[in-house]
């Protein structure tokens, strides 16, 4: 399986905007922004959440929300406020909010077929 990145822009509450290269990870629920990014766009923590990593380790991180723009869609999304050396990750919750799915075989994003049930 390959590694796929997408270029996007994130915007905070004061309309500060930053371009960011996001790793698309369909196994991760929430989008994560590194500390340098979320501080630059003035995001503020809204709550604490506990997360379990793939190795079983539990970590606590603060969560906020931002406006995200990708080539195929844009909207508000929850984001984990990462630490200094964390990588920017695009998670499934954001993809679903934007109505997108990731095809890991073609390494592309495409519109999802939504069900109204």
What residues fall within each predicted segment?
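Pepsin/retropepsin-fold aspartyl endopeptidases
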Residues: 1-117
């Amino acid at each position: 399986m390959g590694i796929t990145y997408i270029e996007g822009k994130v915007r905070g509450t004061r309309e500060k905007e930053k371009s960011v290269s996001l790793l698309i990870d369909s196994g991760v629920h929430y989008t994560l922004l590194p500390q340098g990014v979320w501080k630059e766009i003035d995001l503020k923590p809204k709550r604490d959440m506990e997360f379990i990593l793939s190795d079983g380790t539990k970590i606590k991180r603060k969560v906020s929300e931002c406006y995200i723009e990708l080539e195929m869609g844009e909207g508000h999304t929850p984001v984990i406020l990462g630490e200094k050396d964390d990588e920017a990750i695009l998670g499934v919750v954001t993809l679903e909010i934007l109505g997108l799915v990731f095809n890991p075989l073609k390494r592309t994003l495409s519109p999802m077929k939504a069900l109204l049930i």
